[in-house]
From Swiss-Prot:
InterPro entries: Arf1-5-like (IPR045872), P-loop_NTPase (IPR027417), Small_GTP-bd (IPR005225), Small_GTPase_ARF (IPR024156), Small_GTPase_ARF/SAR (IPR006689). Coiled coil: none annotated. It comes from the Eukaryota. Belongs to the small GTPase superfamily. Arf family. Keywords: ER-Golgi transport, Golgi apparatus, GTP-binding, Hydrolase, Lipoprotein, Myristate, Nucleotide-binding, Protein transport, Transport. GTP-binding protein involved in protein trafficking; may modulate vesicle budding and uncoating within the Golgi apparatus. This is ADP-ribosylation factor 1. PANTHER family: ADP RIBOSYLATION FACTOR-RELATED. It catalyses: GTP + H2O = GDP + phosphate + H(+). The keyword Transferase does not apply. A lipid is attached at residue 2 (N-myristoyl glycine). One of its GO terms (cellular component) is Golgi apparatus.
Length: 197
């Protein structure tokens, strides 16, 4: 029993890992966000055909972030990345009022997938530095986020080029994974302390 409790505590305090899928319409800023988080700088990007994957270390959590291209022709491929996804980052170009309904349709289509039923949702309302950008409350309304009653979600205003808001979003994700692990480990600890006869 002592060895089992020792293993439990090492799991509680070990570095945690989280698989993140980052999607959104094309030109929303996904790749810029990924490399701002990874390198701390802006990199020149081209439209992503396929995916980029990087590991971002933050607050004792190793986030494996899959940035998948957003052009309409390759969106059907998004579903191939759903398996084992714990967190979904949906990036919205807050300045693109013409396509916010399209963004909503794509988001709702994804969230209906069984493989993503347990994934937490972080929405990055990106490009907040632009003068015509919709604020987080307006994006929340346009995407219909309040209708998501069975899912943990959060929206964060961001500016990928300056990095503003990105780490606040990662804070929310890290708290979500900590809470999930704590609930799971708490259940295991109760079972160890009070096993059924």
């Amino acid at each position: 029993m002592g060895l089992t409790i020792s293993k439990l505590f090492s799991r509680l305090f070990a570095k945690k890992e989280m698989r993140i899928l980052m999607v959104g319409l094309d030109a929303a800023g996904k790749t810029t966000i990924l490399y701002k988080l990874k390198l701390g700088e802006i990199v020149t990007t081209i439209p992503t055909i396929g995916f980029n994957v990087e590991t971002v270390e933050y607050k004792n959590i190793s986030f494996t972030v899959w940035d998948v291209g957003g052009q309409d022709k390759i969106r059907p491929l998004w579903r191939h990345y759903f398996q084992n996804t714990q967190g979904l980052i949906f990036v919205v170009d807050s300045n693109d009022r013409d396509r916010v309904n399209e963004a909503r349709e794509e988001l709702m289509r994804m969230l209906a997938e069984d493989e993503l039923r347990d994934a937490v949702l972080l929405v990055f309302a990106n490009k907040q530095d632009l003068p015509n950008a919709m604020n987080a409350a307006e994006i929340t309304d346009k995407l219909g986020l309040h209708s998501l009653r069975q899912r943990h979600w959060y929206i964060q205003s961001t500016c990928a080029t300056s990095g503003e808001g990105l780490y606040e979003g990662l804070d929310w994700l890290s708290n979500q994974i900590r809470n999930q692990k704590a609930n799971c480990n708490g259940t295991m600890l109760l079972w160890l302390l009070y096993p059924e006869k």
